[in-house]
C-alpha cells in the first residue's frame, strides 16, 4: 500500500511476492518485476501476471539460486512469454552483449551500480568491496536460512560457526526490525506465515528471516562492516573504480555495441 500511495511506477522484488500482492499492484497500475532464480519460479510468477522477470544466476549477490546465469537465462526464455532481464555477474558491456546473444532483453546490475560515485553506500563499505577478489565471496545459509552470496567476512564466519546462538540473534533482530518499521507483532507473524507458504520455507528459515535486513542495514546504511553483511555478486572482483552512473551506463552501451559489431563482422 505504501508503494501505491507513493505512486511508485515499478516494483521489483528480491524474492517473489504473494499472488495477492501482485494482483493489488497490477490493479493500481504498477509494473511488477520480481527476481527469480529457477525456471519453476518464473513459470509461477508468469501465471500471476507479472510484467517481466529478472532471472538471476548463482553468480549474483544476496539471495541466489544454484543455476549459473548462462544456463538459467535460456531455461527461463523457453519457459515464459515475458521480457527477461538477465542478472548475476554482469559488470560491463561485454556481459550485456552476451545476455542479448542468449535472448535476454537486457541486464540488471546490483554490485556494479553499488560501486559508483553516486551510490549512497558509505565510503568505507565501498572500500571493502573494491578490495574483494572474485574468489572472496561465499554462499551461506547462516544469515536467514536461505542461500545468500556475500563477501566472506569475519562476521559471516562467526554466523556460520555460532549455530547455537543463531535463533536468539534472529529474535533480537526481529524486534529491532519491528521497531524500525513500525510493524506490529501480529503483522510480523502474518508475514512469516505468508513467506513460509509462498516460498516453501521451513519454520527455521522463517524464524531467521529478520536477520538479513538488519545485518544489511548495519553495513549499507550505518557503515558498520564489522557487525553486518556485504551482499555481493562474483563480478565484484572485476571492479576497481567508482565512476558516475552516467559514465558507467554510457561506457557499457559503447562496449556492448563494439562487441556486437565484432560478432556481426563489423
Regions found by a protein language model. Name each.
Residues 1-85, 92-111, 182-186, 191:
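Alpha/beta enzyme core
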Residues 69-81, 91-266:
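Conserved active-site-proximal phosphate/metal-binding subdomains
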Amino acid at each position: 500500500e505504501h508503494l501505491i500511495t507513493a505512486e511508485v511506477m515499478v516494483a521489483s522484488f528480491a524474492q517473489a511476492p504473494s499472488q495477492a500482492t501482485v494482483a493489488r499492484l497490477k490493479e493500481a497500475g504498477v509494473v511488477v518485476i520480481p527476481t527469480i532464480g529457477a525456471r519453476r519460479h518464473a513459470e509461477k510468477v508468469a501465471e500471476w501476471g507479472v510484467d517481466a522477470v529478472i532471472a538471476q544466476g548463482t553468480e549474483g549477490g544476496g539471495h541466489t539460486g544454484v543455476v549459473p546465469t548462462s544456463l538459467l537465462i535460456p531455461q527461463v526464455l523457453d519457459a515464459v512469454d515475458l521480457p527477461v532481464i538477465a542478472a548475476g555477474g554482469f559488470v560491463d558491456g561485454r556481459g550485456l552483449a552476451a545476455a542479448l546473444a542468449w535472448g535476454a532483453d537486457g541486464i540488471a546490475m546490483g554490485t556494479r551500480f553499488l560501486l559508483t560515485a553516486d551510490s549512497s553506500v558509505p565510503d568505507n563499505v565501498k572500500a571493502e568491496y573494491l578490495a574483494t577478489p572474485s574468489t572472496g565471496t561465499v554462499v551461506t545459509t547462516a544469515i536467514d536460512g536461505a542461500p545468500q552470496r556475500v563477501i566472506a567476512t569475519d562476521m559471516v564466519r562467526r554466523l556460520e560457526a555460532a549455530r547455537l546462538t543463531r535463533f536468539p540473534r534472529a529474535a533480537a533482530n526481529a524486534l529491532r526490525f519491528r521497531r524500525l518499521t513500525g510493524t506490529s507483532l501480529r503483522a510480523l507473524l502474518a508475514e512469516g506465515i505468508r513467506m513460509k507458504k509462498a516460498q516453501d520455507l521451513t519454520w527455521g528459515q522463517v524464524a531467521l528471516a529478520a536477520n538479513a535486513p538488519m545485518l544489511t542495514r548495519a553495513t549499507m546504511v550505518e557503515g558498520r562492516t564489522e557487525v553486518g553483511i556485504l551482499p555481493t555478486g562474483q563480478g565484484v572482483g572485476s571492479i576497481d573504480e567508482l565512476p558516475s552512473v552516467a559514465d558507467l551506463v554510457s561506457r557499457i552501451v559503447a562496449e556492448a555495441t563494439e562487441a556486437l559489431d565484432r560478432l556481426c563482422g563489423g
